[in-house]
Each structure stands twice: as structure tokens, then as C-alpha cells.
Amino acid sequence: KQLLKEALAPEPAPKPAPEPAPEPAPEPAPEAAPEPAAAAPEAAPE
């Protein structure tokens, strides 16, 4: 089964797809999340 998959998918198509997807997704998500969270506790004590 592995030999058939490798022979049918010898093109560089499936490689560039999964690479650029997981990179820009996890970066902007966690960064923009902690920002608004810190602003909440600051305005609370005031």
C-alpha cells in the first residue's frame, strides 16, 4: 500500500500545502488572545 501511495504522490503538491497552513495559523491566534486578556484585569481594579 505504501508503494502505491508514493508512486501516485511523487509530486511536490502535498508538501507546500500543509507547511504554510499550520505556521501562520497558530502564531496570530495566541498572540492576539493574551493582549485583550491583560487589559481586562487592569480596568477592573480601577
Swiss-Prot record:
Secreted among keywords: yes
Each PAPE repeat occupies one of these ranges, namely 16-19, 20-23, 24-27, 28-31
Superkingdom of this entry's organism? Eukaryota
> Tissue specificity, please?
Expressed by the venom gland.
Task: Keyword check for NADP, yes or no.
Answer: no
Name the record gives this protein: Pape peptide
Question: Which stretches does the entry tag as region Disordered?
Answer: 1-46
Regarding protein family, the annotation reads: Belongs to the non-disulfide-bridged peptide (NDBP) superfamily.
Q: Which pairs of Cys residues are joined through disulfide bonds in the record?
A: none
Comp. bias regions, Low complexity: 1-10, 34-46
**Localisation:** Secreted
Q: Compositional bias (Pro residues) spans?
A: 11-33
Q: What is any one of the record's Gene Ontology cellular component terms?
A: extracellular region
Assign the protein's first listed, main location to one coarse class.
Answer: secreted
Its lineage opens with: Eukaryota, Metazoa, Ecdysozoa, Arthropoda, Chelicerata
Keyword terms: Repeat, Secreted
